[in-house]
């Protein structure tokens, strides 16, 4: 068996309250040969992260979540899991809080897919 066949796909978690947006993100990332698990509940997402051997990246769409979402960002930071925050609007407070909690980047929707994929690839490969 070649080492190429033994290579595991990078695992990315997606979190969004909006199931349709989550499904789209899962599809786009899956087409790039990533293993992707979509979540709509941050509690379940963090629990799932803790049961996995390796999570390479989490993409969190904070739309529709209350201020408690930041404690889940902090949990990811403490677990040393890189994450991106997707925000419905450009707002300095959101960007500052995301970075304070350890986000690698705060992106404003709507997303440019090509840019998102470039960023995901660079984070997963590092």
Region locations from a protein language model:
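Alpha-helical interaction/dimerization surfaces of two-component signaling modules
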Residues: 27-32, 75, 97
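Conserved phosphotransfer cores of two-component systems
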Residues: 51-53, 75-81, 101
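A Lys-centered signature of the CheY-like receiver
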Residues: 109
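Acidic, metal-coordinating helix/loop segments flanking the phosphotransfer/catalytic sites
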Residues: 40-57
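Alpha4 helix (beta4-alpha4-beta5 surface) of REC/receiver domains from two-component response regulators
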Residues: 71, 90-106
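Conserved phosphotransfer microenvironments
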Residues: 22, 42, 59-76, 91
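Non-catalytic signal-transmission and effector/linker regions of two-component phosphorelay proteins
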Residues: 1-28, 46, 114-126
């Amino acid at each position: 068996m070649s080492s190429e066949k033994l290579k595991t796909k990078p695992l990315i978690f997606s979190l969004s309250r909006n199931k349709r947006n989550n499904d789209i993100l899962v599809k786009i990332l899956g087409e790039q040969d990533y293993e992707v698990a979509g979540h709509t509940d941050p509690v379940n997402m963090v629990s799932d992260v803790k049961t996995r051997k390796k999570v390479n990246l989490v993409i969190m769409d904070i739309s529709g979540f209350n201020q408690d979402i930041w404690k889940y960002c902090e949990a990811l930071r403490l677990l040393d899991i890189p994450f991106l925050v997707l925000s419905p609007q450009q707002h300095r407070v959101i960007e500052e809080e995301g970075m304070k909690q350890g986000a690698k980047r705060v992106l404003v929707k709507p997303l440019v897919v090509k840019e998102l994929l470039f960023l995901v690839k660079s984070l997963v490969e590092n």
